Amino acid sequence: MDDQRDLISNHEQLPILGQRARAPESNCNRGVLYTSVSVLVALLLAGQATTAYFLYQQQGRLDKLTVTSQNLQLENLRMKLPKSAKPVSPMRMATPLLMRPLSMDNMLQAPVKNVTKYGNMTQDHVMHLLTKSGPVNYPQLKGSFPENLKHLKNSMNGLDWKVFESWMKQWLLFEMSKNSLEEKQPTQTPPKVLTKCQEEVSHIPDVHPGAFRPKCDENGNYMPLQCHGSTGYCWCVFPNGTEVPHTKSRGRHNCSEPLDMEDPSSGLGVTKQDMGQMFL
């Protein structure tokens, strides 16, 4: 009986010992799992931190590049702007130099330059003041008027262009109303100034027997050949109407050739030959 009880008690204790032997194995598996998860989380955090660090460095470099680009643009615009006129320091000269007359030779040889034409106009000062606040808002317009308007429309935002377009409409209406109020005055042709030949012809009618009526060209100058219809004589004249000596006759004349002499009273220059040689 005692032996049976020992066997029963030993048989009942065997499952309990088997169950107690499995507990350390499950605890070991859980420890490995927790360790793996912890290492994975640590690696993820380290990767995120490294990525954030590199992004921060790249952002700093981008900010520096942006600031450098803006500074270069401002420097370029500043170089293109007209320079303000420098104040002229008062001249310090001794009294003998003030009393000495200035030499006109150097002044006549050197071309006169307008030093206030560039960089000292009202438009330049206003442009210089406005470009300090917003240099990008004032582009350089070097094309024709339609091309400049198209460039402005593309460079300006929608609101600014609407404001500018509204201003142009108001300006156009103002110009149209101003032109409509202006009365068109009849254009008065200025009186035509008559030349000496035309004035002489105006005093003589077309048909007047016995009177000499000169002939004028389209510019109002005397024709080189003048003829008197009543007597039949013809002669050559200078452009001012003065008769050329020794050319009056009833024969044919050729006044188109250049004359060898000129009348001093004609105002055309000095005689080419001496008047005394002509009468010889």
From Swiss-Prot:
Q: Name one GO cellular component term.
A: late endosome
Q: Which CDD domains match?
A: TY
Cystine pairings recorded for this chain? 197-216, 227-234, 236-255
Q: Identify the taxonomic lineage of the organism of origin.
A: Eukaryota, Metazoa, Chordata, Craniata, Vertebrata
Subunit architecture: Nonamer composed of three alpha/beta/gamma heterotrimers. Interacts with CD44; this complex is essential for the MIF-induced signaling cascade that results in B cell survival.
Q: Which SUPFAM superfamilies match?
A: Class II MHC-associated invariant chain ectoplasmic trimerization domain, Thyroglobulin type-1 domain
Q: Which Pfam families match?
A: MHC2-interact, MHCassoc_trimer, Thyroglobulin_1
Q: Which residues lie on this side of the membrane: Cytoplasmic?
A: 1-30
Q: How does it sit in the membrane?
A: Single-pass type II membrane protein
Gene this chain is encoded by = Cd74
Q: What is this protein called?
A: H-2 class II histocompatibility antigen gamma chain
The entry lists its GO molecular-function terms as: amyloid-beta binding; CD4 receptor binding; cytokine binding; cytokine receptor activity; macrophage migration inhibitory factor binding; MHC class II protein binding; MHC class II protein binding, via antigen binding groove; MHC class II protein complex binding
Residues found modified as Phosphoserine = 9
TM stretches of this protein: 31-56
Q: Which Gene3D superfamilies match?
A: MHC class II-associated invariant chain, trimerisation domain (1.10.870.10), Thyroglobulin type-1 (4.10.800.10)
- The chain's Extracellular topological domains, given as residue ranges, are 57-280
InterPro entries reported in the protein's UniProt record: CD74_antigen, MHC-II_Gamma/Thyroglobulin, MHC_II-assoc_invar/CLIP_MHC-bd, MHC_II-assoc_invar_chain, MHC_II-assoc_invariant_trimer, MHCII_invariant_trimer_sf, Thyroglobulin_1, Thyroglobulin_1_sf
The segment annotated Disordered runs over 246-268
Annotated Thyroglobulin type-1 domain ranges read 194-255
